[in-house]
UniProtKB/Swiss-Prot annotation:
Binds 1 Mg(2+) ion per subunit. GO terms for molecular function: ATP binding; magnesium ion binding; nucleoside diphosphate kinase activity; succinate-CoA ligase (ADP-forming) activity; succinate-CoA ligase (GDP-forming) activity. It comes from the Bacteria. This is Succinate--CoA ligase [ADP-forming] subunit beta. It is an enzyme of class 6 (ligase).
C-alpha cells in the first residue's frame, strides 16, 4: 500500500524530521487559505497521486500568488494526472498539497528498502538527488552508498555519520543527517514499511538539511497491525480490478495484453505467462486464484478478467493438488454460464482428478477448449485470441 506525499510528511514530522510547512487541501478556496496560513510570498503546489513524474506532467508548480494557487487547484482537483508511471488514464487528483517554498543549494537522495537476499533493511544514499535513482544505479552504481541495518540493534548513529562523510557533508550537516537517518530507520521498522524514499533530501541555502519529498510503501501483509496506516489508504488510487480481486483474496495484476490468465499458484501463473509470451501471445493479467479455488472465487476471477475490454481469450491453467480438478471444472462451467463469457476459453487441468475434470468440461456442452498440455494450451489460446 502506498501513501501520498502529504501523508508521508505527516509521519516524518512525528519523528522530528525537517519538512516544509504545508496543508493538504480539497478545494481551490482552501488552497488560497493555506497560502495565508503558511505565509511568505511564494508557495509550491503539488497534485497528490500515487505516481512519480508529477513535475514533468504539470502536477507540481511554483506559485507567487494566492490566485495562482487557487487556479492550480481548480485545474487539477477532480481531474486525472497522467505521468510516465501511470497508465493512459492517469490517477485521479482529490487533494492538493500547498507548502512553503524552499531555497535549494544541493539535492541528495536517501532511501531504504527491505533487501531480501540479506534479509535486512538497507539504506541507500547518493549525491545524485532529484532524479530517477534506478537510472543512477544502472548508469553510475558507484554513486550509490549503502548501509545495512542490523535488526537486533537497529540503525546506529555511526552508520549515519559514515554516510554523511561519504556524501561530502560537513559540520552541523553531519549531525542533522545522522538524526534524519536514525529517525527514518525507526519509522521504517515501527510501521512495517517496504520502501521509503526522500528524493530529494536537500541542502538549503542556509546549509541545513530538509526532506523535500516523501515516498512511502507499506508491506501489505503487515496492515492488520497498522490501523493508523490502514486508515490512510486512498482507494481512488487503486486499480478497480485489483481492488475487486483483493476483496476475494485473489492476487491480480493488470497488464497490457489480450489473453486473460487464471491460474492457481503464483509460480505456475508466472510460468503460464512466460509460455503464452513464448508462443507469441501477450498476457492481459497475472491472476492467482490460490489453493482455495471455489466456484464463487472462479466466478469473480472471470468477472475481473473480462472487465478488461482488451481480453480476446482466456486461459485457465489449474494444477490440482489441494484443490480437485473436477471441482474447478464445475466452477468454470458455473462461472461461464453466470458471467456469460463471449470470448474463447482454453482450459488445461492437471493433477488431482484431472481426467474427471476434463470429462465434466466435455459434457458441459459449452464452448470450452480442452488442452492436453501447457504448450498445447498456450498455442490454442494464442490462436483463439487472433481469431483463428
Amino acid at each position: 500500500m502506498n501513501l501520498h506525499e502529504y501523508q508521508g510528511k505527516q509521519l516524518f514530522a512525528e519523528y522530528g524530521l525537517p519538512v516544509s510547512k504545508g496543508f493538504a487541501v480539497d478545494t481551490p478556496e482552501e488552497a488560497a487559505e493555506a497560502c495565508d496560513k503558511i505565509g511568505g510570498s511564494e508557495w509550491v503546489v503539488k497534485a497528490q497521486v500515487h505516481a512519480g513524474g508529477r513535475g514533468k506532467a504539470g502536477g507540481v508548480k511554483l506559485v507567487k500568488s494566492k490566485e495562482d494557487a487557487k487556479a492550480f487547484a481548480q485545474q487539477w482537483l477532480g481531474k486525472n494526472l497522467v505521468t510516465y508511471q501511470t497508465d493512459a488514464n492517469g490517477q485521479p487528483v482529490s487533494k492538493i498539497l500547498v507548502e512553503s517554498c524552499t531555497d535549494i543549494d544541493k539535492e541528495l537522495y536517501l532511501g531504504a528498502v527491505v533487501d531480501r537476499s540479506s534479509r535486512r533493511i538497507v539504506f541507500m544514499a547518493s549525491t545524485e538527488g532529484g532524479v530517477d535513482i534506478e537510472k543512477v544505479a544502472h548508469d553510475t552504481p558507484e554513486k550509490i552508498l549503502k548501509a545495512t541495518i542490523d535488526p537486533l540493534v537497529g540503525a546506529q548513529p555511526y552508520q549515519g555519520r559514515e554516510l554523511a562523510f561519504q556524501l561530502g557533508l560537513k559540520g552541523d550537516q553531519i549531525k542533522q543527517f545522522t538524526h534524519i537517518f536514525v529517525g527514518l530507520a525507526k519509522l521504517f521498522q515501527d510501521y512495517d514499511l517496504a520502501l521509503l524514499e526522500v528524493n530529494p533530501l536537500v541542502i538549503k541555502k542556509d546549509g541545513n538539511l530538509h526532506c523535500l519529498d516523501a515516498k512511502i510503501n507499506i508491506d501489505s501483509n503487515a496492515l492488520y497491525r497498522q490501523p493508523k496506516l490502514r486508515a490512510m489508504h486512498d482507494p481512488s488510487q487503486d486499480d478497480a480490478r485489483e481492488a475487486h480481486a483483493q476483496k476475494w483474496e485473489l492476487n491480480y495484476v493488470a497488464l497490457e495484453g489480450n489473453i486473460g490468465c487464471m491460474v492457481n499458484g503464483a509460480g505456475l501463473a508466472m510460468g503460464t505467462m512466460d509460455i503464452v509470451n513464448l508462443h507469441g501471445g501477450k498476457p492481459a493479467n497475472f491472476l492467482d486464484v490460490g489453493g482455495g479455488a471455489t466456484k464463487e472465487r472462479v466466478t469473480e476471477a472471470f468477472k475481473i478478467i473480462l472487465s478488461d475490454s482488451n481480453v480476446k481469450a482466456v486461459l485457465v491453467n489449474i494444477f490440482g493438488g489441494i484443490v480437485r480438478c473436477d471441482m474447478i471444472a464445475e466452477g468454470i462451467i458455473g462461472a461461464v454460464k453466470e458471467v456469460g463469457v463471449k470470448v474463447p476459453v482454453v482450459v488445461r487441468l492437471e493433477g488431482n482428478n484431472a481426467e474427471l475434470g476434463a470429462k465434466v468440461l466435455a459434457e458441459s456442452g459449452l464452448n470450452i477448449i480442452a488442452a492436453t498440455s501447457l504448450t498445447d494450451a498456450a498455442q490454442q489460446v494464442v490462436k483463439a485470441a487472433e481469431g483463428k
